């Protein structure tokens, strides 16, 4: 078997004092926290598209990436090489999961029938490699946005033929996701939206989107796919206005169409900020709705208005993200998928590894800090005290549905002063700083 990364050793944990860029400083996969190895808390995953398909191309320049599989000119040889490279990459980084779009792993043919046959050959290669590896599929999905046929959308297209093609493509993607033991299946509507309402039948598009998702649910039941269906919200890009704008919008859509019981959310950090939210906001919304399924781990540049998909390095963000995951009970059929790409000028193979290492370290550290915050209940206690008025007296009656406008008016009408608690935001931010510093100091 050809080795694709001979210059890269198996990445080891060396501790926080290490200056080796090809070593973990905070991520020890076998470190046991709360009775479970860290790797099982975090469930890291490699995104096939960014790691093995992205070439460093941008709207203003040609590809820059130096990749060992680029030596292959035949599309099938390159596809097989990428699969083999994936397993070597995961094993050297001690990552146990990967995710893919159908068109990432195999090239398209002239017809859908031909494309499916090509896809089957690559899936067989993946299955062969899985036999000798502990690498598993976290989730699969279909690329319903790159091909020109999807210029008007897939489930929300104006063409019944395109709708049929998209349905057949998702049918096949569900089949191979099941065949490979995927824990979930993601729906991301990059072209499900509009550029202008001047040419859009908004009602029909939304109804057709619901019909499409319902068909997917029904087919999954038919073939016995028990993985978790996930919606990945994003407000814009490539489409000006996308229907799965954020968690709240997508949940309202699912609820309105009686689909909410079948779906959870795959939350991406950079999508949250594009929607004008923090990463934690989207995770909190999903958590309180009981719909936090999985995470696409990355970060954006707040000075730029597009999806930069950078590797996560912000300890505050990862701490607050893992706080929400822990409070939700941890991942079940989900994990932390690095939907992140190295910068265009970081074109060496080594940079691929370094990007994943820093992302894994940052989330590992964030988890350790968040675990202490949850265990010590410092935020819980403050919030409970802040809202204490709803635990007793008239507040308790409000919560229990025993108060109405007349009763509340009678209660408040002669009160002269209302004393409010301080929000203490500065204190809590200081407390978060202290937990970060203290946790790092205690690490070996």
Curated annotation (Swiss-Prot):
Compartments, record wording: Cytoplasm
InterPro entries named among the record's database cross-references: Xyl_isomerase-like_sf, Xyl_isomerase-like_TIM-brl, Xylose_isom_bac, Xylose_isomerase
Residues reported to bind Mg(2+) 1: 232, 268, 296, 339
GO CC, alphabetical: cytoplasm
Coiled-coil stretches noted in the UniProt entry, renumbered to this chain: none
EC code: 5.3.1.5
SUPFAM superfamilies: Xylose isomerase-like (SSF51658)
Disulfide bonds: none
Cofactor binding: number and manner: Binds 2 magnesium ions per subunit.
Entry's Gene Ontology molecular function annotations: magnesium ion binding; xylose isomerase activity
Top-rank taxon, per record: Bacteria
Keywords annotated in UniProt: Carbohydrate metabolism, Cytoplasm, Isomerase, Magnesium, Metal-binding, Xylose metabolism
Annotated GO biological process: D-xylose metabolic process
Pfam families per the UniProt record, alphabetical: AP_endonuc_2
Residues annotated as catalytic: 101, 104
Gene3D superfamilies associated with the record: Divalent-metal-dependent TIM barrel enzymes
Binding residue positions for Mg(2+) 2: 268, 271, 307, 309
Substrates-to-products reaction catalysed: alpha-D-xylose = alpha-D-xylulofuranose
Family, per entry: Belongs to the xylose isomerase family.
Binding partners and assembly: Homotetramer.
Name by which UniProt lists this protein: Xylose isomerase
Organism: Thermotoga petrophila (strain ATCC BAA-488 / DSM 13995 / JCM 10881 / RKU-1)
